[in-house]
């Protein structure tokens, strides 16, 4: 043949950045740019078209710029001046040292939403974790975080002609992301070897600079691993249960091994959702390796652990069959100094029940001193949900607390609103965002200025929709003339209502479409134009959620709804930012109490958007009359379908009789003064309470400070207190069953259960404590039963010790009930030690009458 086969050599051409622009490169490698809009705008202005093409990724932008373009920019005085201003701000920010008076924290989460450039998040949980890291950086606390670098991230969504969701997984090119490989002491890329039962999984470690703090990401997609283990970090929530377990071992055990390899030790370990619970397996192994027993080690681990639960339903927790769990975790009990059954029991509601699977959440509860839900109501729901773990106590007596989720103001507040706030608010605002006094200044802003800002944001959203969705709609909807008429129908002067969230069925996206005839009447009223914007993804395995999307798209194509109901595809952080700042009303209709917190409405709040929501999650606490609208928290029907119909009718009626008339009560200047009043009330009375600053401070004040204090108390002097408490617990366990009630003295009518209100009764018990010296507490528990058959605590009255003779302790209480009615009474004995953090820390209880 006259032509031989060509030999090709792969060549990577890296863009050579002129020395004058080096500072841009440095800024691009810290995700700080994502919430500092002078930086984002600077990158955008280098090449607006390319910036859009690169998905607003500054690393990719600088890589793709031609050498000529970069050379020209290096001589552009305006760009250089702006770059130097941003760089000075950036360096000043980084040079602040962390506050050493606050405990240091290691934070573990399966996902982080920092920017749509880094596809390592799927929804609210990830965005919350991302916001938390940004605020930790802004508040200058000593925190580091661990997660995964997913090869495919979470899917991007396209919709077929008939409205079927198509999930596309696109590989991320790690070389084009704002991340760096972590090097070991010898300057080699760090690899963490994580022991699974009889082999190791090898994880590369990457760092994301989130302002002042570091987020370490593990990645198994490398040639050191087999084809079975490379996919561990391919997809967020991807694969089967076996892959999920492998992910959770990597996050928990691999996460702690990563921090060890980097020489990082923190005061508090915060497990964000149960996925990271296995951090405590490795931490126990590490203590046992230093010569402590399991019982001593778990005292130290518990005292420095916080577990945050995000789901309100048992189905949301991960359960693993014993066989599968043993396949990968079988080697750990020996390192922890316990038996296999002991490890399994730490993850069971009913220790000893061989049929019960291992639950990560139960394991987290058993190995963390503190547990919290993510709103007041979710705290209550979690007390109920976990009450089976700590038998002997009622849900309302649980130590499970709550911190209501907030949002990172600099990320979610649009530049236009930030400018308005800075113009009118106190100059300390940035550092004191959760101070309600400062926000009251919104009342001094002229109504007209607020209306103008709102209209600017609406027009921006409408332009964005027209530009961004034209192409995808043309591809999917066939008839171009329909697209043009649809584009024309999007009206910035109409009341815009936004609904953006995961399409899980409990979020009830279908609610609005319960009565189509009534809905058609509302959206086609010429006096009160209104349009609905829907967006959201359904989990690839959630057929019902995908069905909902399909139904909404079908309805939106009917002639009477065309252009009035619009579905926007591929909901991500970029679209979310546009939507929560561009609509007038943010609609949220979950089935109560299934919305643990919900944060999109809080983001809307920061942008003068008014909430209209079911009283669930954060809105149950946030709602104020005259500052938004609410659907009652009461359930009228047990039957969900009937409840849905009632709630839908309520939504229609509030829209028709309150929201639309108020919005369109326009004055001569073209806006509604009544509407602006609601906007101002919402900003002044609600916004300061839902900043991420308030959330971070809550975590310190409610949990981190007391955990760190107790951990240092236990670990001082070679862990002396931890050893002492472990020995004391061991003694109580050994003697518990032999403790006996020697005598009991109470009036006959008390014994008969027939007592008078207001009358005082004296009750005396003599108990043989079997040498446990003051380690026994006794209390009288009175309960009442509600209509649903549930028993609740009415009162708990502690007995006093009035006499000691050797091991015989005489306990006495004076008891009276002021309210007449039907009650239940019992006596509860428990081990008592002032150095325990709460009762559920050592859950031994004996009831008697």
Over which residues does each language-model region extend?
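Catalytic cores of carbohydrate-active enzymes across secretory and cytosolic contexts
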Residues: 1-849
